[in-house]
């Protein structure tokens, strides 16, 4: 009995000391939650109410935006960057009409700048809801608000959504596969 009461705490202490340290939210290298939400909000504004000054301040010059959903609709090869730079994002997104956008949830904000959100977009005829998920990657570029919210900017955007619904909503057609190509539900 005495042996196990000594071994258990010593074993736990050894495990704890071997585990990698996690950065607490208060760490200066960790993105504060409120800044992550501000970045998310500003990114959404580039879709719903585009403003060049906001986008320029928000997006790191090395930004890469990838979305096979958008690439399919736009005729860009799948697996390629949708917007390979902040300039390309501003030129492309700035030319698009605003969309409706409802956040279903901000599910993850990591210390190292990842922000994961689920959403529903509304465009055109709004026949079908187009649900999507986006992973934003923010990086610290400075100590203050000279760039991005409090020095943080977006370096990566990864978005996927129901492109079939989007295509129908913008006036295209996207019939489901027929016959044996359909998934069977039991």
Which positions does each model-derived feature cover?
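C-terminal and inter-domain tail/linker signature
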Residues: 19-186
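Cleavable N-terminal signal peptides of Sec/SRP-targeted secreted and luminal proteins
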Residues: 3-19
């Amino acid at each position: 009995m005495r042996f196990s009461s000594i071994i258990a705490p010593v074993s736990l202490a050894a495990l704890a000391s071997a585990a990698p340290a996690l950065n607490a939210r208060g760490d200066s290298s960790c993105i504060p939650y409120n800044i992550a939400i501000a970045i998310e909000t500003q990114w959404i504004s580039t879709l719903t109410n585009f403003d060049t000054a906001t986008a320029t301040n928000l997006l790191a010059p090395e930004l890469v935006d990838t979305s096979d959903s958008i690439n399919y609709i736009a005729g860009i090869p799948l697996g390629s960057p949708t917007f390979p730079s902040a300039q390309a994002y501003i030129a492309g997104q700035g030319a698009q009409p605003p969309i409706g956008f409802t956040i279903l949830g901000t599910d993850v904000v990591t210390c190292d700048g990842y922000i994961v959100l689920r959403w529903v977009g509304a465009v055109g005829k709004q026949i079908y809801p187009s649900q999507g998920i986006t992973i934003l990657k923010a990086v610290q570029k400075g100590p203050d608000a000279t760039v991005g919210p409090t020095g943080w900017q977006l370096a990566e955007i990864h978005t996927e959504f129901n492109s079939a619904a989007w295509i129908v909503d913008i006036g295209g057609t996207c019939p489901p596969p027929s016959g044996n190509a359909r998934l069977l539900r039991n």
